[in-house]
Amino acid sequence: MKVLIVGSGGREHAIAWKISQNPKVNKIFAAPGNAYNKVIKNCENINLKTSNDILNFAIKEKVDLTIVGSEELLVDGIVDKFQENNLTIFGPNKEAAMLEGSKAFAKDFMQKYGVKTAKYQSFTDKEKAIKYLDEMSYPVVIKASGLAAGKGVVIAQNRKEAEDTLNDMMTNKVFAAAGDTVVIEEFLDGVEISVLSITDSEVIIPFISAKDHKKISEKETGLNTGGMGVIAPNPYYTKTIEEKFIQNILEPTLKGIKEEKMNFAGIIFFGLMVANGEVYLLEYNMRMGDPETQAVLPLMKSDFLDVINSALNKDLKNIKIDWENKSACCVVIAAGGYPVKYEKGNLISGLEKFDVSNSDNKVFFAGVKEENDKFYTNGGRVLNVVSIQDSLEKAIEAAYKNVKEISFKDSYCRKDIGTLYVPVKD
């Protein structure tokens, strides 16, 4: 079986690693991939980036399954193009991908189907948006509606900050066209929970929960990033919280998908906020999270390819996904200066200490390239160091021990991944 994985980050490395464990898979293509093709058997990088190029390659190579990690290509309609050519692809069609591609569309969908979320208004007119600020209490959340690599959300502490943010997004175009429409919503103070799930548009099966760490600096301070680390499961995801999530968010989401006839097999990533004991939906992502995937997939006992095939065959109602009764900690090692300005091309040392077959201690490649059997930095987030242990405390300790084994010039990681939580009793 030939599998094509679209994307170039640590998420795609984790997907390729998990998929490669299925004996039916004898070839993995990565488009464009990264240096992980050097540590996964029968994996080949293909330098393709556009939907049409990827489609033509899949036709030519008779690819059996394509898995899309990249949100941009999903919003661009890559799934629709594959389906028009009778090719099997896992991911949302263009309409369903708009639940991530447009925050304004997603909020309207939530409101229409009774999904519990923060109060909001969407604007394309900056003057009307500024006027609306007078009605808000602070802090307030301002979001660029379009895709902004996970960095398009600003929490403005006062009216001046809010107006400056609107100017940045709508006039100065700091997020390009993503900021043409903005969503202004009430600020919810609480704990964030990430829940990845899989759907065949008839049922949604949640994966285990996770806790992302978005900010660049300790104690969740500094600039937004794509994510600096993850723990799974999330200690705040109690049985009570899970029940509220299913009743107030998952079930109405599924109802909306059915009524809007968004017929697809893919991932729904629920970005949740628990505030004052209630669960709210902050956002949908319509693909695996990065770096959540790198912590969640190593905890999955079930065969991921079999799970995906069940979704493609609309058979999720007949399966159960099994999970390890363990905890995962993923620490992102980034290039110094990320997420603003950083160097590429620095030699990475210490990777040889990690056996690729060791499922308890893994290193997933993100911004990594290979030349002459040596690995070099090639992005802002460079490596994902993951440890699976019997307890969260042990997983955190082991992950940081492994981080110390790896070095490159100006490497940086947060020192507090997973340590901020307070154990929660249900």
Question: Language-model segments: what does each one mean?
Answer:
Residues Q21, K38-V39, F90, K112-G114, ...:
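Solvent-exposed alpha-helices and their adjacent loops that cap or buttress functional pockets
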Residues K38-K41, M98-A104, S217-E218, D360:
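Short, charged, surface-exposed secondary-structure boundary motifs
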Residues V153-T293:
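Internal nucleotide-binding/catalytic subdomain
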Residues V368-N372, Y376-D426:
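Generic C-terminus detector
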